[in-house]
Amino acid sequence: MAKGQSLQDPYLNALRRERIPVSIYLVNGIKLQGQIESFDQFVILLKNTVSQMVYKHAISTVVPARSVSHNNGGTSHTQQAPAVEAVADKAE
């Protein structure tokens, strides 16, 4: 596994395994919502009413709807969802 993905993979896997709803903000400001169905080195499959393949290079932020516990090389981390979202939805 690449050194840069040692945090990313366990975090995304915990979100997938626990079926935690997420908001994914893209670099262009678009907000996508759903559950992570699968992921690899380059893409995330996000499922809502349909499945979407989202390229990781287009993602700015992944925000879980609730706190998530994940294990990174024997060290346990807890990430909590923010109380207030700082990014506004982009009107189309």
Curated annotation (Swiss-Prot):
The gene is hfq. It comes from the Bacteria. Residues 69-92 are annotated as: Disordered. Homohexamer. InterPro entries: Hfq, LSM_dom_sf, Sm. Keywords: RNA-binding, Stress response. PROSITE patterns: SM. Residues 9-68 form the Sm domain. This is RNA-binding protein Hfq. One of its GO terms (cellular component) is cytosol. Residues 69-81 have a biased composition (Polar residues). RNA chaperone that binds small regulatory RNA (sRNAs) and mRNAs to facilitate mRNA translational regulation in response to envelope stress, environmental stress and changes in metabolite concentrations. Also binds with high specificity to tRNAs. Belongs to the Hfq family.
